[in-house]
């Protein structure tokens, strides 16, 4: 219950009766302080009147006073300026590293707060706070959604910055890796990222004017040009149609030239995948995009509208894949363009985060602003998370809202972090 005590202290949800220390001195909390989630006391720079005297310093909170010793705070000088030790149960006195006795105060969690908190933890429905959604003010919802949207973009920025580091500071390469990851559309995201990191783009650039060679390197590095990667029933047809063999021979030549090593094809997942999401199709689309010089960050930065961004990312498969989903398996002819749905997802999960991250990196707000503009312009994603919130009465107007709700579920609801959620706050204070 220590987390709940933190919450009660932070929001000053104390009982109406006067507060007092264990030695019966009256306490008035002027400012509970700044919540610290890192090492050190729980709240910094609190302002508290004790027996009429104003104290400014840090506050430490525990379930039991004896936890002070359990956590070895009595041996840690960082806790020497604690002006008040707040506990749910005072079961012992406490001293700091200098041997000075701490001022202690017992705080009881209000019954209604405890009851509502237990409801949030135990209700078998998502979201557990569904009862109060219709009563939330527009200001409360809008401010929280905006904060969640920024939080999600910041989280994605960290992932992009890590890719930039792995790409030795090359933003163009890091953008391609990010784009490739999102071509996995969830299920094959990790495999696509590994594939892109294993792709020597500088070597590919030497053959960029030859689409066949680009596709040979792309498919070969994905580990998809080995005969045993093709289902046995299609192997004979794959060898007879000639395209597989020509690609494989071209890759063998180029892999020897550039000392290439393919990834393990077993990393690719096919189970429950729609055929248009098969790695072969997505890799062919990426090869076409790369060949047409529309897979680079510089081209993307020139796109100032969603329409222009979609034009940059629009692509289709090479001719062979118009009638195939895997090597040797024929299908009805289909140019297999990226669907409007897929384009929207790529803009939400690739274009927007890369603009935001690059804008921060360069200190150019225009790219950050463009990222938010794109989210506002795009329609909200239609997934089970968004639909559940809509069923509770929440209005979801655009992709910014749907991204905020995904962040809310993954980082708050799933982790039971209701005490850090503004909707949870409204629920608890009822």
Where are the language model's segments positioned?
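N-terminal ordered "arm"
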Residues: 7-66, 79
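An acidic- and aromatic-residue-enriched active-site/binding cleft used to recognize and process polar
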Residues: 62-66, 89, 110, 426
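Compact, glycine/acidic-enriched structural inserts
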Residues: 80-82, 86-144
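Hydrophobic, aromatic-lined core segments that form the binding pocket/scaffold
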Residues: 149-404, 417
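Mg2+/Mn2+-dependent nuclease catalytic core
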Residues: 64-86
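Catalytic micro-motifs at enzyme active sites that drive phosphoryl/nucleotidyl and oxygen chemistry
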Residues: 32-37, 45-50, 68-75, 90-96, ...
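Cysteine-cluster motifs in flexible loop/terminal segments that predominantly coordinate metals
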Residues: 403-430
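N-terminal "leader" segments that precede or initiate the main folded domain
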Residues: 1-7
């Amino acid at each position: 219950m220590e987390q709940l005590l933190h919450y009660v202290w932070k929001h000053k949800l104390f009982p109406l009766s006067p507060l007092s220390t264990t030695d019966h001195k009256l306490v008035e909390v002027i400012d509970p302080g700044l919540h610290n989630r890192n090492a050190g006391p729980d709240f910094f720079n609190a302002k508290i009147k004790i027996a009429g005297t104003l104290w400014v310093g840090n506050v430490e909170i525990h379930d039991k006073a004896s936890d002070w010793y359990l956590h070895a705070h009595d041996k840690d000088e960082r806790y020497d300026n604690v002006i008040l030790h707040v506990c749910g149960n005072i079961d012992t006195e406490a001293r700091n590293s200098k041997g000075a006795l701490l001022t202690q105060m017992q705080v009881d969690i209000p019954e209604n707060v405890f009851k509502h908190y237990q409801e949030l933890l135990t209700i078998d429905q998502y979201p557990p706070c569904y009862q109060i959604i219709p009563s939330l003010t527009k200001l409360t919802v809008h401010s929280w959604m905006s904060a969640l949207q920024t939080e999600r973009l910041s989280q994605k920025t960290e992932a992009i910055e890590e890719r930039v580091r792995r790409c030795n500071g090359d933003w163009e390469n890091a953008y391609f890796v990010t784009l490739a990851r999102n071509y996995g559309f969830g299920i094959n995201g990790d495999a696509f990222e590994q594939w892109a990191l294993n792709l020597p783009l500088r070597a590919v650039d030497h053959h960029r004017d030859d689409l066949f060679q680009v596709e040979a390197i792309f498919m070969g590095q994905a580990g998809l040009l080995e005969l045993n990667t093709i289902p046995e029933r299609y192997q004979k047809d794959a060898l007879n149609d000639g395209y597989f063999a020509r690609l494989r021979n071209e890759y063998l030549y180029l892999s020897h030239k550039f000392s290439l090593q393919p990834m393990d094809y077993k990393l690719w997942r096919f189970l429950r995948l729609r055929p248009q999401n098969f790695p072969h199709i997505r890799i062919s689309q990426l090869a076409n995009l790369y060949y047409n010089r529309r897979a680079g960050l510089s081209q993307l930065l020139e796109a100032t509208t969603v329409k222009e961004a979609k034009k940059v990312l629009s692509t289709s498969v090479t001719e062979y894949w118009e009638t195939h989903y895997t090597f040797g398996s024929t299908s009805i002819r289909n140019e297999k363009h990226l669907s409007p749905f897929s384009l929207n997802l790529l803009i939400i999960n690739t274009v927007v985060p890369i603009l935001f991250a690059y804008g921060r990196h360069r200190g150019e707000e225009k790219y950050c602003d463009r990222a938010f503009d794109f989210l506002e312009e795009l329609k909200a994603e239609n997934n089970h998370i968004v639909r559940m919130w809509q069923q509770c009465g929440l209005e979801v107007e655009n992709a910014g809202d749907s991204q905020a709700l995904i962040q809310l579920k993954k980082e708050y609801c799933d982790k039971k972090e209701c005490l850090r959620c503004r909707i949870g706050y409204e629920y608890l204070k009822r």
